[in-house]
């Protein structure tokens, strides 16, 4: 037995506890680090483990749309997104999902998803990663549930959706025009997304949002395999984080980053492409 093995019945029972705790008929978005949770199969094999997790998710979240990240960050350099051939770059589960279910993949560059049990998500490309028509906008409008399996709030991309809607001072919009390829059909896209300044010391995140969400009982923890899962309803997450940003526009940053960002914005108003690149 390998050290990553976790009993699949145990894992299913733990995931069912999560399922019981969330409202009916809403989608789930699962950000995960499967290596931390464990492999519910005897073999240490990415494809076998991918299939095992796919079956677990389908068995547990039977009536829900299951939104799984398949992000391809290299689009920012290549400016080409091949929906069927560009594998996910956020762990082996993202690669497995594209290999098996590319027809279920959303068509927006960078922040794209495979959606199992897709009831009514529209997969067409969005011009803005977190804007109108994006998977994030659709997910939040459906009051979906965020599931962080073995990862923390800093790996939670819905955080960026709230920041985009709040027009935070420490991010700015940048265009990445390029090409989407699907079934040999090429589609030009004027794609944009919010980015941070190139200097990582200026915008460095603390863990305060996760701490505050847990203290407010908006986020809840569940044991899962060798790790734990944090869950949060997206509408509560949105309201809480938005309010914190209203009270303190640099709320999620470290103290040093807050001081640097505040000094920059007092002088320049906000971060922008012209000032930062």
Where are these regions (language model features)?
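N-terminal and secondary-structure boundary signal
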Residues: 1-277
């Amino acid at each position: 037995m390998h050290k990553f093995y976790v009993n699949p019945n145990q894992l299913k029972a733990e995931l069912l506890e999560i399922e019981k705790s969330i409202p009916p008929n809403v989608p789930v978005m699962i950000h995960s680090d499967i290596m931390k949770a464990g492999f519910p199969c005897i073999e240490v094999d990415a494809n076998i483990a991918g299939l095992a997790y796919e079956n677990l998710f389908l068995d547990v979240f039977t009536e829900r749309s299951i939104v799984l990240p398949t992000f391809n960050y290299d689009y920012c350099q290549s400016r080409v997104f091949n929906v069927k051939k560009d594998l996910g770059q956020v762990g082996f589960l993202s690669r497995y999902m594209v290999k098996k279910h590319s027809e279920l993949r959303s068509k927006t560059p960078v922040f794209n998803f495979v959606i199992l049990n897709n009831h009514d998500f529209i997969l067409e490309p969005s011009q803005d990663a977190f804007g109108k028509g994006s998977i994030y906008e659709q997910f939040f409008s459906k009051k979906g549930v965020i599931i962080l399996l073995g990862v923390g709030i800093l790996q939670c991309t819905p955080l960026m959706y709230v920041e985009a809607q709040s027009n935070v001072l420490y991010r700015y919009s940048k265009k990445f025009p390029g090409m989407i390829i699907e079934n040999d059909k090429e589609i030009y896209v004027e794609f944009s997304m919010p980015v941070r300044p190139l200097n990582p010391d200026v915008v460095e995140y603390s863990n305060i949002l996760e701490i505050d969400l847990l203290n407010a009982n908006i986020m809840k923890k569940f044991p899962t395999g060798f790790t734990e899962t944090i869950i949060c309803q997206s509408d509560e997450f949105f309201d809480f984080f938005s309010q914190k940003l209203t009270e303190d526009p640099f709320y999620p940053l470290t103290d040093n980053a807050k001081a640097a960002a505040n000094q920059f914005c007092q002088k320049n108003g906000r971060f922008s492409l012209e000032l930062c690149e």
